[in-house]
Regions:
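Class I S-adenosyl-L-methionine-dependent methyltransferase catalytic core
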Residues: 1-273
């Protein structure tokens, strides 16, 4: 007899060959971003909906609760709502949170009774954590079942002048440590044997490749002691807005400078023991 309590997704593995849309390789080659429904790419720095979609198909069931501590314009919660998952998001900037709530509210829910809660707070503070706990109570749960984190790639994009904003961290070390504060704040709310994913890219500064992805991977393992690294996924980057219509210029710069052009980002997948 199948043990339903151990199941973390809605996949019928007796018919596993039917799931041709689900990625199982560590190299993710994804085309144009999904712009259906409430999804859009007006917010510079938001990630493509296909990432949370893939993660939710693999690691959640309908009715589960998904947490995004770096909500932005709401991509994760939009996708959660359309897939029948409850969503909780934390956003530092009130004006961005308002737009996120508007986007999420405009999306149709896959199932009745789906809740989407947006909390305006610094995600490393007690206020943010207590807000998430209150949202869990409102939904009727004690833990979240998936955490998706897509932080700023340090100072590549300046989202605000707020000192609490990770894009304003003065050093890579400060950026990494403050990201660890977020892991520490929320990893204990993750249900046992459930998953946490970090979506992050690297940067190039002062003629040096800065491996932000691996720094955050190590910090996640350090600050979330019950987390186990399960996968390192490499996803292609296409139509990068910062390099749009400048392909030849960047190719020339790469040839002159002896470096390679960023065409990938990482998705680090962890499981809570």
């Amino acid at each position: 007899m199948k043990q339903q309590s151990a199941k973390i997704n809605d996949l019928d593995l007796h018919n596993w060959k039917e799931y041709t849309d689900i990625l199982t390789d560590s190299l993710w080659l994804i085309g144009a971003r999904d712009k259906s429904g409430a999804h859009n790419n007006k917010y510079h720095g938001n990630f493509i909906p296909q990432i949370p979609n893939q993660l939710m198909q693999r690691f959640t069931q309908k009715g589960d609760i998904v947490l995004d501590p770096f909500l932005g314009h709401g991509t994760t919660l939009i996708e959660a709502k359309r897939m029948g998952r409850h969503g909780i998001g934390v956003e530092l900037l009130p004006e961005v949170a308002r737009l996120a709530k508007k986007n999420i509210d405009s999306e149709s829910a896959d199932s009745p009774g789906i809740c989407s809660e947006v909390i305006v707070a610094d995600n490393s503070t007690d206020k943010a954590k207590s807000g998430v706990v209150d949202a869990l109570k409102k939904i009727g749960g004690e833990n979240v079942h998936l955490i998706v984190l897509h932080p700023p790639y340090h100072d590549i994009i300046k989202f605000s002048d707020r000192k609490e904003d990770l894009c304003n961290a003065s050093t890579v070390e400060e950026f990494t440590s403050r990201f660890g504060d977020v892991i520490e704040a929320f990893s204990d709310l993750l249900a046992r044997k459930r998953y946490l994913a970090v979506v992050i890219g690297d940067k190039y500064t002062n003629s040096e490749w800065v491996p932000l992805g691996f720094y955050l991977m190590q910090e996640t393992l350090k600050r979330g002691p019950r987390l186990q690294l399960k996968s390192i996924l490499v996803k292609n980057m296409v139509n990068n807005r910062a390099k749009l219509n400048q392909e030849n210029l960047w190719r020339y710069r790469a040839l002159v400078g002896g470096f390679y052009i960023f065409k990938h980002e990482y998705i680090f997948v962890f499981k809570k023991n």
